[in-house]
């Protein structure tokens, strides 16, 4: 999905999900800054090197670190889920930008949606699987 903005820059978009987090990623040619929900990416992700590494990993694999600005709107979940959702959305946007990137990103596992979500609590149990203590006598 490529669209033109008012100042005629091409935008590539991708959506990523992880657990209950959703990230809508827009890729614009620029200087390599990451903006998440209107804040710099470093401050939004609490200056955590792990979250930043996860978020930037598709660009680093392709060697496009400082060529694109990334604008993200995220909602739901925690920082881990949001960072992984950003990674998936960014990888999908890079595939839309250049279909040749797909093979590299697929081999690294960046285009695979992690389907694991929280299991629901069942009645009669304390949690999803934890049962109350059983006494035979």
Curated annotation (Swiss-Prot):
Any one GO molecular function term: RNA binding
Domain of life: Eukaryota
GO term, biological process aspect, one: translation
Alphabetical keyword list: Chloroplast, Plastid, Ribonucleoprotein, Ribosomal protein
Cellular component terms (Gene Ontology): chloroplast; small ribosomal subunit
SUPFAM superfamilies assigned to the protein according to its UniProt record, in alphabetical order: Ribosomal protein S5 domain 2-like (SSF54211)
InterPro entries per the UniProt record, alphabetical: Ribosomal_Su5_D2-typ_SF, Ribosomal_uS9, Ribosomal_uS9_bac/plastid, Ribosomal_uS9_CS, Ribsml_uS5_D2-typ_fold_subgr
Compartments reported by the entry: Plastid, Chloroplast
Keyword Nucleotide-binding belongs to the record: no
Keyword Plastid: yes
Annotated family: Belongs to the universal ribosomal protein uS9 family.
Protein name: Small ribosomal subunit protein uS9c
The species this protein was found in: Gracilaria tenuistipitata var. liui (Red alga)
């Amino acid at each position: 999905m490529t669209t033109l903005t008012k100042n005629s820059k091409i935008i590539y978009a991708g959506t990523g999900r992880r657990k209950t987090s959703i990230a809508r990623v827009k890729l614009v040619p620029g200087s390599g800054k990451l903006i998440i929900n209107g804040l710099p990416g470093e401050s939004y992700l609490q200056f955590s090197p792990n979250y930043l590494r996860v978020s930037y990993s598709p660009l680093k694999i392709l060697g496009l670190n400082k060529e694109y600005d990334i604008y993200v709107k995220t909602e739901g979940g925690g920082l881990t889920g949001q960072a992984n959702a950003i990674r998936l959305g960014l990888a999908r946007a890079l595939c839309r930008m250049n279909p040749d990137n797909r093979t590299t990103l697929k081999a690294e596992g960046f285009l695979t949606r992690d389907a694991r979500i929280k299991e629901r609590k069942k009645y009669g149990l304390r949690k999803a699987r934890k049962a109350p203590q059983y006494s035979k006598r």
